[in-house]
From Swiss-Prot:
This is Acid phosphatase A. CDD domains: MPP_PAPs (cd00839). Monomer. Acid phosphatase involved in the regulation of fungal phenotypic traits and virulence in C.parasitica. It comes from Cryphonectria parasitica (strain ATCC 38755 / EP155). Keywords: Glycoprotein, Hydrolase, Secreted, Signal. It is an enzyme of class 3 (hydrolase).
């Protein structure tokens, strides 16, 4: 990893003050033009539509319907928010009472917008097969965010000068090319890498604008995906602060708008759900679901259901004992807290306890920092393991999805570092994957030292994962090479799911 001092040493004397500002996207002449569009599951039969504009909207509105030529329904809100250093306002409108598993067309109300479409969420309990794509640690491409492998080998550089509208490269391009193969996207942490602005020397003279420019460019690049697919987000360390190294001198210079997950919270806070009302016939499940809803704090920790899976999103950065990004944490990022002491773990237990396997047989937990990884101690979050792993085992979580380490990894079902003897055939321990190789300015992390529970590790090119919920008992996991679409690894987890509620 480069440091700011390394960058400054490489510059001519007294040149810093004369460096050009970062490359912002052009502001449209119509300031109501929607940009950076994003969709999310907001609740049962509900989808939130989020977008940014270059002026505050008094009443953001969305027109929609099941025909592209008949957008006869309209919903509006009063949600148009910003923060100190942002050039844009984040707008949110929630579309409710949608027919499940149906193609809807929508248009953000503006004098300069187009019609887009999305597939509405499946009802909890729908046992139809579906696939979700998992993309983590995804950065901006172009002048502010070229990608280069972390090992520094110049023969393995990947320089991407610009992003064409066709999205014909790497992970975003593969998501576009395989549009019909998946129904929604899971992205637990690290968006854009604006806090790495100092790695591009031309940014060093104007870090405040460089940070915002990277965010604007990244979310513009992501919009063709996130504006047409439900895109579920939770935080990573690169959302925490204006720079990622935890250097006190830079910490003090971070403006208020670029501290404490501000952009992430403003951008996604009104889009993500709290948790779903339980559709279980069990009274205790309903009580736990209601408790979880009261304790949820989106976009940091929350849950949702889609067809036959219950997904619990966690914050591995703050709000649990010894959290790495918390004040005085090991990462030095001074983030949070976002709830009362113990709130996230209270939510986590109530939410897991609420899951009725006759409705949603599959239980998935997604967060950013892993506690199983190759490459040594620096790649794992021991505090996360202490906080979350016992509850994941107790309530029978089937799969843990994480990133942070910039490669792709798959692990045998494991608990407390002991591999489940059943392997992939009805284990009691959770299976874990890392899908952190999507591509960003920091490049790929070498596989490094292996561990006994690892079954696959890949760090040669950018990649991501897909999860296919085949039926109530079989979950297929594939890792895909972004550039080619080749399958790098494929496995299937079998779970009998004979118990309505798991507590082991």
């Amino acid at each position: 990893m480069y440091t700011l001092l390394d960058i400054l040493k490489g510059l001519p004397l007294l040149a810093v003050a004369a460096i050009a500002s970062a490359d912002y996207p052009t502001i449209p002449s119509d300031l109501t033009t929607p940009v950076q569009q994003r969709l999310a599951i907001s609740g049962m039969n509900s989808v939130s539509v989020g977008w940014n504009t270059y002026e505050k909207l008094l009443k953001p509105c969305v027109q929609y319907g099941t025909s592209s030529t008949d957008l006869s329904q309209e919903t509006c809100s009063l949600i148009s928010t910003t923060y100190n250093t942002s050039r844009t306002w984040s707008n949110t409108v929630i579309l409710t009472d949608l027919t499940p598993a149906t193609t809807y067309y929508y248009q953000i109300v503006s004098t300069n917008s187009t019609v887009n479409s999305f597939f509405s969420p499946r009802t909890p309990g729908d046992k139809s097969p579906f696939t979700t794509s998992v993309v983590i640690d995804l950065g901006v491409y172009g002048a502010d965010g070229f990608t280069v492998d972390a090992d520094g080998d110049p023969t393995r550089k990947v320089l991407i000068p610009e992003v064409e509208p066709a999205l014909n490269h790497t992970t975003i391009g593969r998501l576009a090319d395989t549009w019909d193969d998946y129904e929604w996207v899971l992205h637990p942490g690290d968006f854009g890498y604006a806090d790495d602005w100092y790695l591009t020397p031309t940014n060093v003279g104007d870090g405040v604008n460089a940070y915002e420019a990277i965010l604007e460019n990244f979310y513009d690049q992501l919009a063709p995906i996130a504006g047409g697919k439900v895109y579920m987000a939770s935080p990573g360390n690169h959302e925490a602060d204006c720079e990622e190294l935890g250097t006190p001198a830079i910490e003090l210079s971070c403006p208020e708008g670029q501290k404490n997950f501000t952009d992430f919270n403003v951008r996604f806070g009104k889009n993500m759900p709290t948790s779903f009302s339980s559709t279980s016939s069990n009274t205790k499940a309903k009580v736990n679901a209601n408790k979880a809803a009261a304790l949820a704090n989106p976009p940091f920790w929350y849950s949702f259901e889609y067809g036959m899976v219950h997904v619990t999103m966690i914050d591995t950065e703050t709000d649990f004992p010894n959290a790495p990004d918390a004040p005085f944490g090991t990462a030095g990022l001074d983030g949070g807290p976002f709830g009362y002491t113990g709130q996230q773990l209270d939510f986590f237990e109530a939410d897991l306890a609420s899951v009725d396997r006759t409705v949603t047989p599959w239980l998935l937990v997604a967060g950013h920092r892993p506690w199983y990884s190759t490459g040594g101690q620096s790649n794992i979050c021991s505090a996360c393991k202490t906080a979350f792993e016992p509850l994941m085992y107790q309530y029978g979580v089937d799969l843990g999805v994480f990133g942070h380490v910039h490669n792709s990894q798959r692990f045998a079902p494991v608990n407390n570092s002991v591999v489940d003897p059943a392997g992939m055939d009805n284990p009691t321990a959770p299976m874990y994957i890392i899908a952190g190789g999507a591509g960003n300015i920091e490049g790929l992390s070498s596989v490094g030292n292996n561990i006994s529970s690892n079954r696959f590790a890949y760090a040669e090119t950018f990649s991501y994962a897909t999860l296919t919920f085949e039926d109530e008992n079989n979950l297929s996991i594939q890792f895909i090479e972004s550039a080619t679409g080749d399958i790098l690894d494929s496995s299937t987890l079998y779970k009998a799911h004979t118990e309505q509620f798991v507590n082991q």
